[in-house]
Amino acid sequence: MEGVSTMEENAAMRKPLILDFLTHHGHSLESFDAVVGRGGLVHPIPGGTYAVNDEMLRDLRECRFGTHVCNLGGILAAEIGEEIGKPAFIVDPPVIDEMTDIAHLSGHPDFPRRSVFHALNQKAIAKRYAEDVGKPYDALNLIVAHMGGGVTVGAHEKGKIVDVNNGLEGDGPYTAERPGSLPVLQVLRAAFEHRYGDNYEDQRRFYMSKCGMVAYTGTNDGRVIGQRVAEGDPEATLAYRGMAYQIAKEIGAQSVVLGGKVDAILLLSLIHISEPTR
């Protein structure tokens, strides 16, 4: 999203690319019955399929509940749907909230734990697994770990994601670019010293894109890091194993949420996994 200042500008940049892609692959817009977009950050809602309406579009355009590229999903779906006279939807946006009351507690009432995670991917892989084993999704206890640019690990209890780390705001394992959980007093000191920027937006951008593996190794490219690990680079090896260590800890924590009654642990990985890490 570099180089554009608003969601409308970003949508205007991406929309012709999407339409050209569909045309290139022989898909006529008139052949679609509906348009579905990924995301975005709306107010907390249960999992499901939602029609895009004016209120949702206003929240997405104004980034009322957070700024993320996934806000474009509903915006673009609505614009394309309006052009062809078809309905627009979003499915399992990343803010679906099925967490228990106790899971929302953080340590202070002013800072409740929020449910922000890779909901669409987690729900999809969990339901696919349920279909593969011939059981209803709502009859299983599953732990699903999405590992990509962000990492979220969810406890799926009988069809509801009752606890999950917030992959957007610094909760859980560090990732390719994000820091995960950090010591709050050290972060406060860095903020007051303006170590990573003079204002909120500069510091937010730092914590969203300059931490994790980037901070430890100088790159977010898993292929490069994997090659360095294979060549015996001690810095890359320690950082990579550290990320795996933290993800494994998060999986273990979610098993406690499910009372140790776990039918399966599902790993959805979009990052390169080197042989030594396995």
What does each model-found stretch correspond to?
Residues 30-40, 89, 259-270:
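Short glycine-rich phosphate-binding loop at a beta-alpha junction
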Residues 125-128, 241-261:
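Phosphate/ATP-binding catalytic cores across multiple sugar-kinase/actin-like superfamilies
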Residues 20-33, 132-135, 251-263:
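Phosphate/pyrophosphate-binding loops at sites that engage ATP/ADP/AMP, CoA/4′-phosphopantetheine
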Residues 22-69, 95-106:
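Short beta-strand-loop/turn "lid" adjacent to the catalytic site in phosphate-handling enzymes
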Residues 193-241:
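A mobile "lid/hinge" subdomain adjacent to the ATP/sugar-phosphate binding pocket shared
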